[in-house]
Swiss-Prot record:
Annotated gene: ndvA
Upper lineage: Bacteria, Pseudomonadati, Pseudomonadota, Alphaproteobacteria, Hyphomicrobiales
Organism of derivation: Rhodopseudomonas palustris (strain ATCC BAA-98 / CGA009)
Protein name: Beta-(1-->2)glucan export ATP-binding/permease protein NdvA
Topology with respect to the bilayer: Multi-pass membrane protein
GO CC entries: plasma membrane
NCBIfam families: PRK13657.1
């Protein structure tokens, strides 16, 4: 994306308030153009006071400086008041749009598929969101206040100076040419460098976020010094990339300041000569010195504008790239709200591949009636989790159809489909908020009584009541203030509170002790009645009473039946059951031997 197209996209993000933005920009243009009247009045006053009335001064002739001075004061006060009003409105608009775009970005990334978040560091997404919206704010504010006015005021100033005195105007044109050539050279030199700088910033953010997210690992393996040194190394590479960019722009500042001084001195020198020849007045010399000062201000604004666009471009490109990411799964234009489902689920010849080559699911077909419990069994990577991900449309299959209550799930809105599905993940996911807030994720309007009932059914009420703040206890970042079993019980309570017709349990009792697991299984048996439940199981003891067990291998269902039927067949499931039984027996024997030895 070129700088021009990038800047155009920045202005498009003004959205519904773009019209107000253009009004502010045009107002600033008019105010910037009006500033040219001040040097003209100044020069005219000097001419009047010196008794040398010049022609073509754009001001009616007068022999008294007071009317001109009064006009200057009135005009100056008016422009100051208008400038303050426009600046205030510009600030408010830029702040409003920054918050609006930040919220839109946040909403957008939350809707992107899990596959996107799996491959993108959360620290990078936060950095892109904050730096991107800050860059947008600066660009908008610059557009409202300076960019548009600075560029177009040059178009007014140069012809005006030609009209007043073309000989002195030549010096202003030379100054413009020097600025243009120098700026073009520096932009060409630093364009790629700034992209490298932003890449190093991203690495710095990602590395710091990675270490902070794994503090326990860093401390337990005594990696503090190593991680700090790693951050120093990234910081060093960042400085190495940044210094050449700063040096080039420092050179621009030095040369432009020198050009400014030379131009002013040249105006005086040429002006004195022309005055001696009767080709200009003292007032015009003063006027052109003021013109030169204004021109320098405008040129510096243009240079700063180009510099800012160049500096912000990598951040803006990252931000817009994320904003333009299209979710692989989204609602169709004709998608409907399915309401509350009964729980009938059908997979019909479903196939799916992550990379388009090796199938993760191949020709999967089965039907789950309302109230059925379907267990999915198999080795890691066999396709169990992928099948469930397809059910709640984390992905769409390349072929085949998945139906709920006879409706293709692709014809149902994502929100209504997912409202009907409750999920208990193997790793409990909790917000850094109170226990009550975490439970209300399942039902935002849940009453305190409903919270207590759900917690009680999930065997969580006891530890909640033991805490000092009860349901107001903060769970900590990712639930770190709670034990693994406590987090999992809250996750189960949240799913029960949602009361969905379809329930997914991804080894939901894996983090619980044997006593709590036994209690929880009784509660789950009661809750699962009348619901279609899918259980991703690794411990076969948890699926003893499943309506049907699907045994996965390399994306295919190789066996299907009840627990007893599959064991009787002596196939893959029976081998897995025997292996787990032998492991459990070995563990029991080892524990018994240890106990006997102590006796």
């Amino acid at each position: 994306m070129s700088l021009f197209h990038l800047y155009t996209r920045v202005l498009q993000l003004l959205g519904k308030e773009a019209r107000l933005g253009w009004i502010l920009a045009v107002a600033n243009l008019l105010l910037a153009t009006a500033q040219f009247a001040e040097p003209i009045l100044f020069g005219r006053i000097v001419d009047v006071m010196s008794g040398n009335l010049a022609t073509g001064a754009l001001v009616p002739e007068t022999r008294s400086p007071w009317p001109l001075l009064g006009a200057w004061v009135g005009f100056g006060l008016f422009t100051i008041m208008c400038s303050a009003l426009v600046a205030l409105q510009a600030d408010r608009l830029a702040h409003r749009r920054r918050q609006a775009v930040l919220t839109s970005y946040f909403e957008h990334i939350l809707q992107l598929p899990i596959s996107f978040h799996t491959g993108t560091h959360s620290g990078r997404l936060m950095k892109v969101m904050l730096q991107g919206t800050d860059a947008l704010w600066r660009m908008w504010l610059g557009f409202f206040r300076e960019h548009f006015a600075a560029i177009l005021s040059l178009v007014v100033l140069l012809p005006l100076s030609l009209y007043i005195n073309w000989r002195l105007a030549i010096l202003l044109f030379v100054l413009c040419i020097v600025f243009t050539v120098l700026t073009t050279l520096v932009v060409h030199k630093t364009y790629g460098m700034q992209g490298e700088v932003e890449a190093q910033y991203s690495d710095l953010s990602a590395r710091a976020s990675d270490a902070l997210g794994n503090v326990a690992l860093v401390q337990s393996f005594v990696r503090v010094d190593a991680e700090v040194q790693g951050l120093r190394n990234v910081s060093g590479r960042l400085l190495e990339a940044q210094m050449p960019v700063l040096s080039w722009w420092a050179l621009v500042t030095v040369i432009t300041r020198a050009s400014t001084t030379i131009t002013v001195l040249s105006i005086f020198a040429l002006g004195i000569y022309l005055n001696q020849q009767g080709l200009t007045s003292v007032g015009e010399i003063v006027m052109f010195v003021s013109f030169a000062t204004l021109l320098i201000q405008r040129l510096e604004q243009v240079v700063n504008f180009i510099n800012n666009v160049l500096m912000e471009a990598p951040r803006l490109r990252e931000f817009i790239a994320v904003l333009d990411t299209v979710p692989a799964v989204r609602d169709r234009a004709d998608a409907i709200d399915c309401g509350r489902l009964s729980g009938l689920v059908e997979f019909q010849n479903v196939s799916f591949s992550y990379d388009g080559k090796r199938p993760a699911i191949e020709d999967l077909s089965f039907t789950a009636l309302p109230g059925d419990t379907i267990a999915l069994v198999g080795a890691t990577g066999a396709g169990k989790s992928t099948a469930i991900a397809l059910l709640h449309r984390a992905f769409d299959p390349q072929s085949g159809v998945i139906k709920v209550d006879g409706m293709d799930i692709r014809g149902i809105t994502l929100a209504s489909l997912r409202r009907n599905i409750g999920v208990v993940f193997q790793e409990a996911l909790l917000f850094d908020r109170s226990i009550a807030d975490n439970l209300r994720v399942g039902k935002p309007d849940a009453t305190p009584e409903e919270l207590r009932l759900a917690a009680e059914r999930a065997q969580a009420l006891e530890f909640i009541e033991r805490s000092d703040h009860k349901f107001d206890t903060n769970a900590g970042e990712r639930g770190r203030m709670l034990s693994g079993g406590e987090r999992q019980r809250l996750s189960i309570a949240r799913a029960l509170l949602k009361d969905p017709p379809i329930l997914i349990l991804d080894e939901a009792t894996s983090a619980l002790d044997a006593v709590t697991e036994a209690k929880l299984n009784l509660a789950l048996d009661e809750v699962m009645k009348g619901r279609t439940t899918f259980v991703i199981a690794h411990r076969l003891s948890t699926i003893r009473d499943a309506t049907r067990i699907l045994v996965f291998d390399n994306g295919k269902v190789i066996e299907s039946g009840t627990f007893d039927e599959l064991v009787a067949r002596g196939g893959a499931f029976a081998q897995l059951a025997r292996a787990q039984f032998m492991v459990q027996e070995s563990a029991r024997s080892a524990m018994s031997s240890a106990a006997d030895a102590q006796l």
